Amino acid sequence: MTYLVANWKSHHTITQSILWLERLHKLNPTFSPQLKTIICLPFTDLPEFNRQLTEKKLPLLTGAQNVSPFTAGKHTGEVTARMLSELITHCIVGHSERRQQFEETSSLVAQKTFQLLDQGIVPIICLDTPYLEEQIKALIKQDIDPERCLFAYEPQAAIGSGQPVTPHTANQFATKLSFLTSPQVKVLYGGSVTAQNASTFVSQSHIQGILVGTDSLTPTDFSNIINSLS
């Protein structure tokens, strides 16, 4: 199985997300049965996007980009894993932008991961070399089974820069992660992924998919990535 994950970040209103979906439907990309495609949307887009997905019968799954580390309670503004469980199958946690802009720690990411797994949602845990071992230790402390998660290697310098790391470098990181966790762990690569380089990453021995930011925002670019992996 190959994973293709789109991270829309803080882009696309409800109206824009539906227009994106309609355009992708018209482009009619080739979805391989071995390709699992997950669109991680803003919270506000999820209900209507899911409804439109059902109508158009596109083989897409939906995910979120963040989750509360808490269960239900007095936590104003928080969106819990239980709330999301009726809307999504996957959720990104620990993205470098949240670590930088909101000072999220590896411990907090592990708490969020625990909440997601408790509700049957697959966490997509973002990692980079400087905090790799720290994050793994935090997950172990929470008794997280790494084989129930997806991990995304997202080197900070490659995000949105147009300069991805080499496939070999990504594979080396994934190999180290497998050594630290489990040989069966699933690793994605994220950072300036395009239709031109996507297949070079998933062809690596320890890379099972890609996490796409900028090129997931335009239906044509994303359709080209789908076709390149199918």
Please state what every model-predicted region is.
Residues M1-S230:
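Active-site loop-to-helix "anion-binding N-cap" substructures in soluble metabolic enzymes
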